[in-house]
Amino acid sequence: MTGLEFSWSWDFIVRFLSITLIDLALSGDNAIVIGMAAASVPRERRKWTIVFGGGLAILLRIVLTSIATLLMQIPLLSAVGGGVLFWVAWKLLRVDIGESEEEKVAKGAQNFRQAIFLIVTADFMMSLDNVIAVAGSAHGSIVLLIAGLLISMPLLMTTGGAISLLIDKFKWLVFVGAAIISFTGTRMIFEDKFIESRLHLSSLVIIVVSILMGIILPAVFIWFNRRKARLAAKSPSL
């Protein structure tokens, strides 16, 4: 079965379930990004942030998976993607923690566009890690690929929406989310084939360094934010 052909055989059903489960299993980080990005916009805009951001992410994943073999031949692509995730984590921290609810409302349209951009960017980078597994299960079937994504993405969006509500109640979850995104970014850098073939680090070392980076980025943000607040307090008000 290739291309757009399909039949409701057991083989089709098994592959379909396989793709759906792989998408769900590998999309935990993506749900966190969606939740953090949605929490950065006023509540009345959150549904559309998740719908537009998630919808664009679906289209991008389909394109990515269809050209998975080509993508994996680009040197350092996974490492660059990991680096971009640090930027995404920092941006989300700045908006979710650095802005009050009033500022979010005042900058509603700007934050809405930024949130969608961050969702799509992070999903693109994180999906670089996932496309080979999904493409392998699809065995060249576009129908299987699209069907699996259409089933898994609504669940991903729902999870992202739930995370945004939790962040409203427990702001410290933003730091947990940033730590997880940083952990994923570090792992992507060290597991890039180009870097891996030169450093030859063990899985344990990669995990330890990834955990440390997951702690360091939020810690640096907290230090930076407190320093900024101290400087603002010392500055004479006009």
Over which residues does each language-model region extend?
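Multi-pass alpha-helical transmembrane bundle typical of ion/small-solute transporters
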Residues: 1-238
